[in-house]
Amino acid sequence: ERLTKRYVELVIVADHRMFTKYNGNLKKIRKWIYQIVNTINEIYIPLNIRVALVRLEIWSNGDLIDVTSAANVTLKSFGNWRVTNLLRRKSHDNAQLLTAIDLDEETLGLAPLGTMCDPKLSIGIVQDHSPINLLVAVTMAHELGHNLGMVHDENRCHCSTPACVMCAVLRQRPSYEFSDCSLNHYRTFIINYNPQCILNEPLQTDIISPPVCGNELLEVGEECDCGSPRTCRDPCCDAATCKLHSWVECESGECCQQCKFTSAGNVCRPARSECDIAESCTGQSADCPTDDFHRNGKPCLHNFGYCYNGNCPIMYHQCYALWGSNVTVAPDACFDINQSGNNSFYCRKENGVNIPCAQEDVKCGRLFCNVNDFLCRHKYSDDGMVDHGTKCADGKVCKNRQCVDVTTAYKSTSGFSQI
């Protein structure tokens, strides 16, 4: 089945050798890196991952860590610097160091395995090893693949080209495609580690690379971005322009269907009890109106309870929720135990001290139920107390663990009537 859409908020750091390699031309370096990110994004679309560049740092005044040709040593320093420096300045999911140094042992890149979202280890190092942008982009996509749990392809792994992205050796004609093995490794990583940081969609204003219509990232100046006209599945979006069609009224919401407002009168939030009011679409908005309910204190469930914030709390339902079927509310004698203040039998706690219930408040403390043939069953946890708003006597409800007159309980203290 199709994987959930995920977003990698990426920071790329170009070291000082990159700065000198491109003769200090920042515009040229930026353009080179934007091109790399666009390619990485295309490579990851089949995995339903979008890669958003949220920061680009060029070490124009000198390296901020010791960059050496020993890739593993440099990578470790970069991870430490990310924790103590970069993450404090800019929230992001993954950082890649792009270096113009010649890494040892024919290494073109290095990254730890399955570390996405880890503060120190969600990193990679990539050598700017070729004048062909695609080759550098595939290398960075490969290292990012390691962070996402993908190991090198073996002979039994296949994609539609001779060598796939996670091939151990980069070919001169590299592949855009992940193998079946890589896809399985990524799925396993997501299931086992469930990395949270790549679930949130980046803000338009966080993406620093120039907007690209069709990359499925919502960027500044775009109203929508559903991919290429061939793959777009959003009927509201014109894939060619990344603008909404002129007839579109809405894109999403409880009162939005097929890009139009749902007609007035369609229920969008059913009443959850006789104390709640069903809300219907207005025909003018994609949002369901604010949740409204009947006034607090209105009798409900054949006078067994009084409405409280859209519900009708009664002791029987609370007993049922705690103990299941074959329950009844315990006799009054059980509730009298709440006058003791011992153990869990009280109305309130003040500074850790149990305050016993007054005689008239006993049905607002610990809840007692008869379960099968057991009398006075109770739970010691907080959910074993009688709920606020529960009827405790005729014309009375529990408020602040006291059994008070229903008209007093719900009288507005601000002088305004309650909505």
Swiss-Prot record:
Ca(2+) 1 binds at residues 9, 93, 197, 200. Ca(2+) 2 binds at residues 212, 215, 217, 219, 222, 225. Residues 210-296 form the Disintegrin domain. GO terms for biological process: proteolysis. GO terms for molecular function: metal ion binding; metalloendopeptidase activity; toxin activity. Belongs to the venom metalloproteinase (M12B) family. P-III subfamily. P-IIIa sub-subfamily. CDD domains: ZnMc_adamalysin_II_like. The lineage of its organism: Eukaryota, Metazoa, Chordata, Craniata, Vertebrata. Pfam families: ADAM_CR, Disintegrin, Reprolysin. It comes from the Eukaryota. Its cofactor is Zn(2+). The active site is at residue 143. It is an enzyme of class 3 (hydrolase). Snake venom zinc metalloproteinase-disintegrin that causes hemorrhage by provoking the degradation of the sub-endothelial matrix proteins (fibronectin, laminin, type IV collagen, nidogen, and gelatins) and disturbances in platelet function. The recombinant cysteine-rich domain interacts with the alpha-2/beta-1 integrin (ITGA2/ITGB1) (collagen receptor), and inhibits the platelet aggregation induced by collagen. This is Zinc metalloproteinase-disintegrin-like atrolysin-A. Its EC number is 3.4.24.1. Keywords: Calcium, Disulfide bond, Glycoprotein, Hemorrhagic toxin, Hemostasis impairing toxin, Hydrolase, Metal-binding, Metalloprotease, Platelet aggregation inhibiting toxin, Protease, Secreted, Toxin, Zinc. It catalyses: Cleavage of 3-Asn-|-Gln-4, 5-His-|-Leu-6, 10-His-|-Leu-11, 14-Ala-|-Leu-15 and 16-Tyr-|-Leu-17 in insulin B chain. Removes C-terminal Leu from small peptides. Negative results: the recombinant cysteine-rich domain does not inhibit ADP-induced platelet aggregation as well as convulxin-induced platelet aggregation, demonstrating no activity on the other collagen receptor GPVI (GP6). It is found in: Secreted. Zn(2+) binds at residues 142, 146, 152. Disulfide bonds join 117-197, 157-181, 159-164, 213-242, 224-237, 226-232, 236-259, 250-256, 255-281, 268-288, 275-307, 300-312, 319-369, 334-376, 347-357, 364-398, 392-403. A motif (D/ECD-tripeptide) lies at residues 274-276. InterPro entries: ADAM_Cys-rich, Disintegrin_CS, Disintegrin_dom, Disintegrin_dom_sf, MetalloPept_cat_dom_sf, Peptidase_M12B, Reprolysin_adamalysin. Monomer. Residues 6-202 form the Peptidase M12B domain. Expressed by the venom gland.
